[in-house]
């Protein structure tokens, strides 16, 4: 009987640890999203982005929201450039992306995983010659991978974070 109780306690502990990791990963993604979004205003002004792009950002983490606006890709590329996350060739700068993730709460392992996912998405879309279109497809691929890991932050928590910073 005592052995069964120990096993139950072990399983419960492992489950709770797994839940905590998922929650903390979603929290890191929230911090990354809000940190990345700090460049949105500058890019919106520089690129004269339409309101539809702002709506796309508002709905970015919703799985059922279809991202189709090429301007969204232009905005993401502009924002990534502001944080030195891309090279002159418009490719992911692995070292800077890794450090950006760590500076927003990711541990080394999670930062590596995020960079790897972005690199995989970048590789899958390499045949797209239009930088904005390719960046949009990379973002869609990345969003799908994050949802697959159950790391996507809720829009409510992101909005709360953004509103408290205003």
Curated annotation (Swiss-Prot):
CDD domains: PBP_GOBP. Antenna. It comes from the Eukaryota. GO terms for molecular function: odorant binding. Disulfide bonds join 43-78, 74-132, 121-141. Keywords: Disulfide bond, Olfaction, Sensory transduction, Signal, Transport. Residues 1-24 form the signal peptide. One of its GO terms (biological process) is sensory perception of smell. Pfam families: PBP_GOBP. The keyword Disulfide bond applies. SUPFAM superfamilies: Insect pheromone/odorant-binding proteins. Present in the aqueous fluid surrounding olfactory sensory dendrites and are thought to aid in the capture and transport of hydrophobic odorants into and through this fluid. Belongs to the PBP/GOBP family. This is General odorant-binding protein 1. It comes from Epiphyas postvittana.
